Amino acid sequence: MAQSGIRSAAAGWRSKGIVRCPCCAAVLPWPGPGAKCASCGLGIMMLRGVPVLRRFKAGERLDYLDQCSSLPAMDTSKLGIPFVDEALASGRLVLELGAGNDACESPALVKTDAFLYSTNLACLADAHELPFADNAFDHVYSLAVFEHLHSPWAVAEEIRRILRPGGSVYVLTAFCQHVHGYPHHYFNMTDSGLRRLFDRFEAVECRESAFTSFREISAGIVGDAYQMVKAVRQATSRTQWRKKVRLLRLLYGMRAVM
């Protein structure tokens, strides 16, 4: 098949029946405004034209989903990552987990995130419970996301489930990095930790990315600490502020050396 033919087939992924209801996992036609799951009756919410295919915890505020303009735009096809370049060039179906405000456009690329950082996302989805069928994708990549997942081992299993036999995965995640990001920073990964997460995959290769100097790490810590103190000072009285600054300073000092 010609490359254009492959791309055309990949571009029609919305009509291939790979989307699943986030509540009951039944086959879900690509949802539009007013769509409902024929099996459980779940109404599919649309946020700025993007379908919300994730479940919610009791009391979770839906307005937290809309984070448009809170992240700078980037284009993952211009980062010089060989895996990403080869996956996009293959014409096969590619899933990006935690796409954020990725400006990359490809007919074979399905971009998801738990929050609406961009209206260019295919859908909002929880990486711990992906709304896709088994064996749906040929390639999966995730850039600077795994440190923000509360159960990365569950996400690794979800990737394994939705990946076709012979498929491939690329995960770029933090090792020596201070607390950062929205809404949470849970884990930094060692080589052995990453291997353990993906120990049910046939082949796992771990490599180190460019080293971040101590000066850069320190600058990041100082900048974050300033923003933390500024936010607390604006939100509380002077007496309360003094108490909270001491606590934040202690916590941040512990994070910096642990």
What are these regions (language model features)?
Residues 2-130, 135, 139-143, 153:
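Conserved N-terminal segment of class I S-adenosyl-L-methionine
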Residues 30, 90, 165, 200-203:
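Short, well-ordered coil loops that connect the C-terminus of an alpha-helix to the N-terminus
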Residues 144-148:
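Short catalytic micro-motifs in class I SAM-dependent methyltransferases
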Residues 149-150, 163-165:
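Helix-to-beta-strand junctions that scaffold the AdoMet/dcAdoMet cofactor pocket
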Residues 153-154, 158, 168-258:
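S-adenosyl-L-methionine-dependent methyltransferase catalytic module, highlighting the catalytic core
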